[in-house]
């Protein structure tokens, strides 16, 4: 497996959360449904999605699945974008 040292993990996490937030908003996914699926408080979920920095994996997966997105697609796209930025 290839090492991607040039990728900024903090920026990658922020990009993934931002893409997830956008999808949650576009699909009108409720914080309650994400909370029910993840076990986190809906206010905490909302706060972390709005910060666009990082969030626990369990919460992120619940947000992705509840909004009907593909977690692999979100991660893959974000990694490709971060790789392109690192190479520029």
What residue ranges belong to the model's regions?
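Short, basic-rich loop-to-helix N-cap that marks the start of a DNA-contacting helix
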Residues: 52-65
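Residues in the helix-turn-helix
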Residues: 33, 44, 73
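Recognition helix of helix-turn-helix/homeodomain-like DNA-binding domains
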Residues: 38-54
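Short C-terminal boundary/hinge segments that cap the last helix of small helical domains
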Residues: 68-87
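Short alpha-helical "recognition helix" segments of helix-turn-helix
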Residues: 30-35, 63
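Helix-turn-helix DNA-binding elements, focusing on the entry/boundary residues of the two helices
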Residues: 31, 42, 57-60
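A short, Lys/Arg-rich alpha-helix, primarily the initiator
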Residues: 1-29, 72
């Amino acid at each position: 497996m290839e090492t991607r040292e040039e990728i900024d993990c903090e920026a990658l996490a922020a990009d993934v959360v931002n893409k997830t937030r956008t999808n949650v908003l576009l699909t009108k996914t409720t914080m309650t449904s994400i909370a029910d699926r993840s076990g986190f408080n809906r206010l905490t979920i909302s706060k972390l999605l709005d910060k666009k920095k990082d969030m626990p994996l369990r919460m992120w997966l619940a947000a992705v699945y509840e909004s009907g997105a593909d977690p692999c697609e979100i991660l893959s796209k974000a990694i490709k974008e971060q790789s392109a930025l690192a190479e520029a």
